[in-house]
């Protein structure tokens, strides 16, 4: 398969992935295993070594994400994992991890590769780590991370002459914004239901 066809094929898979993510469908992780495995070849061939390494991580993370969504249940009645807001207590450690990962990835790129875009390549890598982690836990804020990653990647792929991927990531930005509002509504319903359950429990104990 030529690089042009590989670019097109993985772009189609990418469209399917984001649609499944928008629908909160577990099959997004299956597509998320196949697509990055093929992207390793595509990115490496264009000198995007950070993205190639990230594609390896995506493949492994998709396996974890599938397991987490499939088998991880809430403690209450073994219900499926709901969409929720990220706890504020996680903000600082997440930010710290991001900056450490950014610095570490940048060091690897400038030391052991001939990457021409080490700053942005390492930036998208580090933020993608955070985004995938947040997605696996169904945190609403994961969409913020992906909006930034997708916008930067779109520009990078234009510069590197990977047109279909550039188009895909430009579209990702739009879909991610729509996905955020869809998930936000779902998160609010979960929060409201939790409040009502607590209120009913409280009322039942009042005399």
What residues fall within each predicted segment?
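C-terminal transmembrane-bundle signature of multipass membrane proteins
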Residues: 142-147, 152-160, 164-197
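Membrane-interface helix caps and helix-loop-helix hairpins in membrane proteins
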Residues: 22, 44-52, 107-116, 135-139, ...
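Membrane-helix interface "capping/anchor" motifs
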Residues: 19-30, 133-145
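Membrane-water interface of transmembrane alpha-helices
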Residues: 57-75, 184
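Structural signature of hydrophobic alpha-helical transmembrane segments
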Residues: 1-9, 51-60, 114-124
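Hydrophobic, membrane-inserted alpha-helices
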Residues: 10-17, 34-40, 126-131, 147-155
């Amino acid at each position: 398969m030529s690089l042009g066809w590989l670019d097109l094929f993985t772009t189609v898979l990418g469209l399917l992935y984001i649609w499944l993510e928008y629908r909160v469908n577990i099959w997004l992780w299956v597509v998320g295993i196949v697509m990055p495995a093929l992207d390793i070849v595509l990115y490496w061939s264009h000198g995007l070594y950070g993205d190639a390494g990230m594609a390896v991580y995506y493949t492994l993370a998709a396996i974890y994400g599938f397991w987490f969504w499939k088998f991880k249940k809430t403690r209450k009645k073994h219900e499926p994992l709901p969409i929720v807001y990220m706890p504020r207590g996680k903000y600082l450690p997440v930010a710290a991890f991001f900056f450490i990962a950014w610095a570490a990835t940048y060091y690897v790129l400038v030391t052991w590769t001939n990457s021409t875009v080490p700053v942005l390549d390492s930036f998208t890598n580090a933020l993608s780590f955070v985004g995938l982690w947040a997605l696996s836990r169904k945190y609403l804020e994961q969409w913020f991370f992906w909006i930034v990653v997708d916008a930067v990647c779109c520009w990078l792929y234009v510069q590197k002459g990977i047109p279909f991927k550039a188009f895909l990531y430009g579209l990702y930005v739009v879909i991610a914004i729509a996905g955020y509002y869809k998930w936000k509504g779902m998160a609010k319903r979960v929060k409201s239901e939790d409040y009502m359950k607590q209120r009913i429990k409280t009322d039942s104990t009042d005399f």
